[in-house]
Regions:
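N-terminal capping segment at the start of a domain
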Residues: 1-17, 33, 37-42, 47, ...
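His/Asp/Glu-rich mid-to-C-terminal helical/loop segments that flank catalytic regions of hydrolases
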Residues: 248, 367-413
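Structural recognition of the beta-strand scaffold that forms the well-ordered cores
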Residues: 2-5, 39, 103, 118-122, ...
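Extracytoplasmic/secreted proteins, especially bacterial periplasmic and envelope-associated proteins
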Residues: 3, 17-32, 43, 162-166, ...
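Noncatalytic luminal/extracellular "stalk/propeptide" segments of secretory-pathway proteins
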Residues: 10-110, 315
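Metal-dependent peptidase/peptidase-like ectodomains
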Residues: 69, 164, 255, 265-368
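Second-shell loop/turn segments in exported
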Residues: 7-17, 32, 47-49, 75, ...
Length: 413
């Protein structure tokens, strides 16, 4: 934790040299423990080539001649410098095509999966509503795009009440545009670290993962803070440490029946690029992966839960969470379903491809999220240690059992 979340790594910005250093550090731990390398050229690190266009102006959303600007009325996560779609209103069971502009109801549905290339117009969820001015202060960035992919990532735009009212009054089929000035796209890179603890031949795979990147540093941190480094101790050095600690424990003792793959992904903060690459070009067949557990923000307790308790996104969607709890994990249902955390971490790249994949967390919506104040001093190590330790034997048991997690009827993304 001291190394990953220390100032020396400058906040482990997505796709930066500091992220590469973090991936190399994880690779060194994998090598020390004797894991089988699954990275490039016989090593543990995967170098993922992407292309990214740097924006030179704030994105502007145009609806029926009305213009709304990032940083004023909207907060945009663009998947490309220019995105155009015809307006559709989401409804249960609706089939949304790539390239559509989708208006979500207020509150936004929990089971909506944005297709690649779509333009999603959303009301503000509570976590953004409560800190709207802080979010508006952030510059917009185009998500990196994997090479040789057909569509860009979805573009998600959060609207203030006035902008949302204009969108809601627009007619179905109206053209909606999100556009910004941008430099020509140039190659960029991100890095994953991947190793395997091989199990018995013919058995399945358990994927344990976290993300190693964070927000880097900025010369204009929110709130006028003099601290320019976004250390990301909770988000997600805590999850990376959880995977490293489980890796340390699971490599000792007898070989598991099922293979365990440990993956630390890059560029989660810019659209899940590292995990998307892994899912599109898996080092093990996705059909062999029985379960994916992503570890995200476990460094502080959630005040809604008993002490030293973790929660699982999408707990009610599959048989995995209840089974882990039955085997001793201090694991309960996500107490923040309105935040749609199931869809907001690397697990979702696997879940939408059919893998039973969830995120383990204890994030209680603390105010230090995505600010320079997310530092090691805020980590509750007693909580983190007990909670992670409670996952060890259930994960070990899962890796040695015949239990196969399943999606519950109608709950698969």
């Amino acid at each position: 934790m001291e190394f990953l979340a220390g100032d020396a790594l400058n906040g482990r910005g997505s796709g930066t040299r500091d992220e590469w250093i973090a991936a190399s550090y994880v690779a060194a731990q994998m090598r020390r423990l004797g894991l089988e390398p699954l990275g490039d050229d016989g090593g543990y690190v995967q170098k993922v080539t992407t292309e990214r266009a740097e924006l030179t102006s704030a994105p502007v959303l145009t609806i029926g001649g009305r213009r709304f600007t990032h940083g004023k009325e909207i907060y945009a996560n663009p998947g490309a410098a220019r995105v155009v779609g015809r307006l559709e209103t989401w409804a249960p069971g609706a089939v949304i095509q790539p390239g559509a502009a989708v208006l979500l109801p207020d509150p936004a549905p929990e089971d909506f999966t944005p297709p690649q290339g779509a333009l999603v117009l959303s009301p503000r969820p509570s976590i953004i509503k409560e800190r709207w001015s802080t979010f508006l202060a952030r510059p917009a960035r185009v998500a990196p795009r994997l090479l040789k992919t057909q569509h860009s990532p979805p573009s998600v735009v959060f609207l203030d009440p006035d902008a949302y009212a204009v969108a809601a009054s627009a007619a179905r089929g109206d053209t909606i545009t999100l556009q910004a000035e941008a430099k020509p796209a140039v190659p960029s890179y991100t890095w994953n670290a991947v190793g395997r603890l091989r199990g018995e031949p013919g058995k399945g795979v358990i994927l344990l993962s976290a993300h190693i990147d964070h927000l880097g540093n900025r010369t204009d941190p929110p709130g006028g803070s003099g601290d320019q480094i976004f250390n990301g101790a909770d988000d997600d050095a805590s999850g990376a440490v959880a995977v490293l600690e489980l890796m340390e424990a699971l490599t000792h003792g007898s070989r598991p029946k099922h293979t365990i793959v440990f993956a630390l992904f890059g560029s989660e903060e810019t659209g899940g690029t590292g995990s998307r690459f892994f899912a599109e070009k898996p080092v093990v067949p996705l059909t062999d992966i029985l379960a994916n557990l992503q570890f995200e923000m476990l460094g502080r307790p959630d005040g809604k839960l008993p002490p030293q308790t973790l929660w699982l996104t999408g707990y009610e969607r599959s048989t995995l969470g209840p089974e882990l709890a039955r085997r001793g994990a201090r694991l309960v249902q996500d107490p923040h379903p309105e935040q749609k955390f199931f869809e907001r971490s690397d697990n979702f790249e696997f879940a939408r491809r059919g893998v039973v994949a969830h995120t383990v967390s204890s994030y209680g919506l603390h105010a230090d999220y995505h600010t320079p104040a997310d530092e090691i001093g805020g980590i509750d190590f007693a909580h983190m240690t007990t909670a992670i330790r409670s996952m060890l034997e259930p994960v070990r048991s899962l890796a040695n059992s015949e239990f196969v997690p399943q999606w519950l009827p109608g709950k698969k993304p």
